[in-house]
C-alpha cells in the first residue's frame, strides 16, 4: 500500500512500553478521506486518487468546487488533495481511514512548519554573534559582509540573510507508527511532526522503507 492520507495534528503525548520505556508520540487524527476523483493513465496520463476531508459550509464553496463535489456525490470538504497510486483500486465515494496503516510501519509526514515571521541570521541560519566588546558597537547580531568588491559586484543567489522564517512545507521521513486506534481513527507516531496543533498533515508510507 503506497497511498497516503490527510490527517490533523492533535498534539503530543507519550506512551509506555511493557518494559516501562517512555516513548514521545504525536497524535494524528485521520479524518475519513473521501475519494472525490480517480485519475487513470488513459485520461490523465497517470494514476492517482483525489480526496477531501472535513466539512465546509455551502456559502464557502465556489460553484466550480460545488459542481466537482456534486459530481462525485461527496460532501464538500475543506480542500482537495491527491495521492499517486501504484496497484491500488478505489472508487469515487470510497473512504480511506487509519486502518490502512499498522503498528511498526514507517511513514513520512509532511506539514507546514510554524511561521516565525521576520528573523535574523542568528535565529534563521544559526550564525554566531559578533564580539560583545573589543570595539564592537551596535553590531552584535549583524551578519557581517555579504559579498566581495567590484568582482563579482553582486550578492550571489542563495546567500543566507535575514528574512521570513518558517511557514514552509516540511517532510520528516521514516517515523515509526507506535499505535493505531482504528475506532477513533488515530495514529500515534513516534517523535515530532511539522506544524502547529490543528494543522493538516499528510501521512505516507516511508519512501526509504519501500526497497
From Swiss-Prot:
GO BP: any one term: translation
Residues bearing the modification N5-methylglutamine: 150
Molecular function terms from GO: rRNA binding; structural constituent of ribosome
Statement: the UniProt record of this protein carries the keyword Metal-binding: no
Any GO CC annotation of this UniProt entry: cytosolic large ribosomal subunit
Keyword field contains Cell membrane: no
Source domain of life: Bacteria
Keywords annotated in UniProt: Methylation, Ribonucleoprotein, Ribosomal protein, RNA-binding, rRNA-binding
Posttranslational modification: Methylated by PrmB.
Self-association and partners: Part of the 50S ribosomal subunit. Forms a cluster with proteins L14 and L19.
Biological role stated in the UniProt entry: One of the primary rRNA binding proteins, it binds directly near the 3'-end of the 23S rRNA, where it nucleates assembly of the 50S subunit.
Family statement: Belongs to the universal ribosomal protein uL3 family.
Name of protein: Large ribosomal subunit protein uL3
The species this protein was found in: Stutzerimonas stutzeri (strain A1501)
Gene symbol of the encoding locus: rplC
